[in-house]
Amino acid sequence: MDAKTVQVTIDKAVPRWDIFCAVVDNFGDIGVCWRLARQLAAEYNLSVRLWVDQLAPFRALCPTLQECDQQWLEGVDVRHWQGENCTPETSDGAADVVVEGFACNLPAAYIEAMAAREQAPIWFNLEYLTAEPWADEYHSLPSIDAQTGLQKVLFVPGFSAHTGGILRERDVIERRDQWQSHSTYRSLFLKQLNVQCDHNTRLVSLFSYENSALPELLRAMEQFSQKHCVLVPMGRVVASIESYLGESLPLGQAITRGALTVQAIPFLAQAEYDHLLWSCDFNIVRGEDSLVRALWAGKPLLWHIYPQEGEHLIKLQAFLTRYTEGLTPEQAAAVTALWMAWNTQASMVEPWQQALAELPALSRQARSWALLQSGKTDLAAKMVQFCTKLV
């Protein structure tokens, strides 16, 4: 049946949620909103609509997405948000809970529909993830919309008990452990990607913004004593790799220089990207969504934070302070030096070598850190709990 004609009966007794997402940086915003929408529908049996302004980036994460105004995917009512087309007529009235993803500015007509409700909706302004101390103070603070008098609640994802938590499906750790405890899953997955590497090769995933430090990182791997195989989902960083190699890197092709092999793989849907992270020995990730997934993978990682005129380094250091807890001063210094060099586009050779010298300890720490975080209440649960307390 065509997605345009799918009809689903909505139980009016089930709370309705609307999540709005304006795609700013290709995949990060929609990645978070799509995960949140799916989790709310699957784990809490909620009626969820996801409004997205750009379908092309969304389709990269969810290949079954079609080019149409409305469709149902994995229990979520997905709507193409086209400017002010989201009116009371097209949205069947404002929902009980409205999530404004990353201050994306809701359509004026929709806000009017919110104000016209007999019972005001719960209105969340979902912020970006941060480990900065201010998150503890500002999370869940209300503000009043000047035009309508509606209350909007700032919801700040974070790593402490006083923040909004981070996205985590209930079974993600269980699924990860099952995958990593059976080498067959990894072997079959890599075979599907046409990746060939022996057990002595360090497998690295690379999903990054453009970075002038990348050539030095590749050079460090090329000259290292142990072989490295770098798997690169097709995207923005491939051109930089081709410049370093001095030749094109077609999809599926592997090119070897010294101890370094680089292979371009397809851009993966979210579930497959999890499998990539679970399969690799070291993960280089970018933005918010892939960072969180790399954390749940329980493998050593390097994060390329979204650049913001210097402010991102404050955010990066705040996360490093939390992430390196439990490491020795030498181990923490190695992680910090590597991450700072990568995010300031500085020399990478020595930081990479120092980090690899501590890799066994970093592997244990990554695993234990994921376990520690999995014991905390996740973002979707905290949102639902917040709403339940107000009913």
Which functions belong to the PLM regions below?
Residues 27, 34-38, 267-315:
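A donor-sugar binding/catalytic signature common to diverse glycosyltransferases
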Residues 19-30, 207-211, 282:
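Short, glycine-rich nucleotide/cofactor-binding loops
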Residues 196-274:
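Donor-nucleotide binding loops and adjacent catalytic segments primarily
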Residues 13-18:
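Extreme N-terminal starter segment of soluble prokaryotic enzymes
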Residues 325-391:
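C-terminal amphipathic helix plus adjacent low-complexity
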Residues 21-45, 49-149, 235:
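Active-site and donor-binding regions of nucleotide-sugar-utilizing enzymes
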Residues 118-122, 226, 299:
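A short helix->loop->beta-strand "cap" motif at the edges of active sites that frequently abuts
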Residues 127-215:
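A nucleotide-sugar donor-handling region in carbohydrate enzymes
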